[in-house]
A protein has these predicted regions:
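Binding-site signature for planar aromatic cofactors or substrates
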Residues: 1-147
Length: 147
């Protein structure tokens, strides 16, 4: 049976926060304007609540930030053996741009990522997580949003 989504437990925040510096960025998938999956690594992924992640999208009007306005469903994959928290997680949820979080998400991003968007042309994207499936120190786990 699945547990409730709890991204703030079991070392998940540390695993996500240090993923980029350990060379294990989170991959984010969304459906592009042509109806095809688009997958990219996101070094700015952050846990911002028990069932929410945030990332910095470097552009507001193209790519991920534009696509989620019409197609908010996203998938994420993390693989970080030997690091803190789970070794593997597959997550799914719904994303939306949230300019009210721009300052906080940009400031929490690694310097190398901020250097890619020094003029802050991007926007914070918040992902409400519905499901997390993974493998941690205690074996496989499943977390799902409860109604």
């Amino acid at each position: 049976m699945a547990e409730p989504v709890a991204l703030t437990d079991s070392g998940i925040p540390e695993a996500i926060a240090t993923a980029a510096e350990r060379g294990h960025q989170v991959a984010v998938a969304y459906i592009d304007d042509d109806g095809y999956p688009s997958v990219s690594f996101r070094g700015t992924t952050q846990v911002i609540g028990p069932d929410r992640l945030a990332i910095w999208a470097r552009t507001r009007d193209t790519g991920l930030a534009a696509a989620i306005a019409e197609r908010p469903q996203v998938g994420l994959v993390y693989y970080g053996p030997g690091g803190p928290g789970p070794a593997y997680m597959a997550l799914r949820g719904r994303a939306h741009a949230d300019p009210s979080l721009d300052d906080a998400v940009y400031a929490a991003a690694p310097q190398g990522e901020r250097d890619q968007d020094p003029d802050r042309n991007g926007v914070a994207v918040v992902i409400e997580i519905d499901r997390v499936q993974g493998f941690g120190q205690d074996g496989p786990f499943l977390q799902e949003r409860t109604a």
